[in-house]
Amino acid sequence: MNDNIYLVRPALKMKEEALAYREEHFVNGEKIICGSELFDQTESYEEWLESVTRNTSCETVNENWVVTDTFFAVRKSDNRIIGMIDLRHTLNDFLKDLGNCGYSVRPSERKKGYAKEMLGQILLVAKAAGMEEIHISVEKENAASLKVIQRNGGVYERSFDHEGTTADIYKIYLK
């Protein structure tokens, strides 16, 4: 695994860089930022940060959500936010087809191996949390993400229909 990035929990001091990260997705025509715990839908960074923080604990998690750890992937050389990734510790009925993990990479930083590195690092977080496996979904036409999942040990489990498109669920066993 490369050692170019580190995962860090969102913080207020990251607001400006986080908003620039989000804006780059929007300018690129992307309305959904996977792995962002609805950062793409929030008006206020502070409210989103409060929600993300609450969702890290079973005592404070939103009643419609599951305990989730959300991270920015930050490049070590310049502290630029490269991506976002989240880890859902359990799956409810809504999430059973979406999986334990979602991630996104900044449009200008794609095809540089960051997604593989991010997923590899979140697998270590999952293992440290006592998880034995994670499920992760990928749309059929997302060949790049499929490679990331497979290179991190993903094993095909099943296919399903999601909002008019076919997606696959992969399982990654944590050793």
Q: Where are the predicted features?
A:
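Conserved GNAT acetyl-CoA-binding A-motif
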Residues: A126-S137
